[in-house]
A protein has these predicted regions:
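ATP-binding Walker
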Residues: 24
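Walker A/P-loop
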Residues: 27
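NTP-dependent small-molecule kinase module
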Residues: 2-11, 32, 36, 146-190
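ATP-dependent small-molecule kinase phosphotransfer cores
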Residues: 43-93, 97-104, 129-130
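P-loop (Walker A) phosphate-binding loop of NTP-binding proteins
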Residues: 21
């Protein structure tokens, strides 16, 4: 834990933010990182659910995506101002320029990448993904990937999630060990 916190401080980053598509494993990995390093984890979607007292699907249905994105911005900007935490962001939050700018300033960001066909398989079982209702899941994922990938790839590091959270966590530790704290120019794009 101490090495982790020291490295974040030396590169002038307050926390770690996990980015990626819905179903990519951001929350599972963030929980593992938080547990192993004994730091707090926050999930932006869960915070929105707590704040609104409605599920994400219910918010989309009753208030629409525009309202959801407004609340998401407030929640995410508030979360990433905390220190020494891990945050798993909702898949679409990265399209917001204010969120992207705040992440760049304050956080070590990791894009958790997953093959779209694997994502389709994972998400086909889910009933609570409002953007996937009544649509061809793979086509929708391809559309979302086209809109978001350029922002995901602008993260500090990229991790491929092949399915094993333990292996993905070990890859995270490997990435962390490679950060050059004297001259922070780290980019790991696997």
């Amino acid at each position: 834990k101490t090495l982790f916190i020291k490295k974040l401080k030396k590169i002038k980053k307050k926390n770690v933010v996990l980015l990626g598509h819905m179903g990519s494993g951001k929350t599972l990995l963030a929980k593992k990182i938080a547990r192993e390093l004994k730091i707090e984890h926050y999930d932006s979607d869960q915070k929105i659910v707590e704040l609104e007292k409605k599920s994400i699907s219910e918010i989309f249905e009753s208030r629409g995506e525009k309202y959801f994105r407004k609340i998401e911005e407030e929640v995410v900007l508030n979360l990433i101002q905390k220190k020494n935490i891990v945050v798993s962001l909702g898949g679409g939050s990265i399209i917001n320029k204010n969120i992207r700018n705040m992440i760049k300033q304050s956080s070590f960001s990791i894009f958790l990448d997953v093959n779209l066909e694997k994502l389709e398989s994972r998400l086909s079982k889910s009933k609570n993904r409002p953007l996937l209702k009544n649509t061809n899941i793979l086509n929708k994922l391809k559309d979302l990937d086209t809109q978001r990938r350029k922002y995901y790839l602008d993260s500090d590091a990229k991790l491929q999630n092949t399915g094993s959270i333990s292996k993905t966590y070990m890859n995270f530790i490997d990435i962390l060990s490679k950060i050059n704290v004297k001259n922070y120019k780290f980019k790991n794009k696997e």
